[in-house]
Amino acid sequence: YFDHCIGRIIDRLEEKGLRDNTLIVYASDHGEMLYKNGICEKHTFFEDAVAIPLIFSMPGRLPTNAVSEAMVSNIDLMPTLLRFLDVPVPNFVEGRDLAPTFTGSEVQEHVFAEYYHSLDPCRMVRDKRYKYIHTEEDICELYDLDNDPLESINLAWYPQYTDRINRMEELAMKGWEIPRIPLWAPWNDLNERK
C-alpha cells in the first residue's frame, strides 16, 4: 500500500511537469524489531532497529535506480538537503553532505547512533563489520556482524578483541557530551510507570 501511495505522488508530479526539479527523500527515524531478539520497541541498537531506509530521487541530479550499501546517518540529511538547494551549510550543523556517497567517490568508514532512554545514555559506532556499544555505566558490547548477524555473542569479553574495542571506544566517545537531565524529567516518570 505504501509503495502505491508514493507512486501516486510521483505520478502527480509527472502530470504537473514537476518531477524533474523535485527532490524526493524517503527516510525513517528507526527500524522495527518485530519481536526479533524478543524486543518490540525502538530503544535498542540491534540492526533491525538502526538500519533504516534512505531513498533520494531526482532525475538528472542523481543516478537512476542506483543502490548503495554505504553507511550513512540521518544527521547527514540536513547538510545534504542544503547543498541540493545551493544553501550554505552553517558551521554549527553536524553531519556531512552525502553527494560524494551518491556517486561512490566517498564512503564513510563509521556511523554513529545514540539515545537517551530512562536517563541511561548509550552510544554506538559501527563499521562494515563490527558494532561497538557503550553505555554511561561503562558497559561495552562488540559484535561481529559478518559472523554473528543476530548480535548474540558479545566479543567484549574476549581479550583478543581489546585493540578493536579500544579503537572503537575512542571513536564512540570522541566529542560525546552526555547531557545532564534532571531526575524529575517528566518522561522519566512516565517510563518508570511502565
Walk through the language-model features, giving the residues of each.
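C-terminal cap/loop subdomain of S1 sulfatases and analogous C-terminal strand-loop tails that border
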Residues: 30-36, 75-78, 83-145, 150, ...
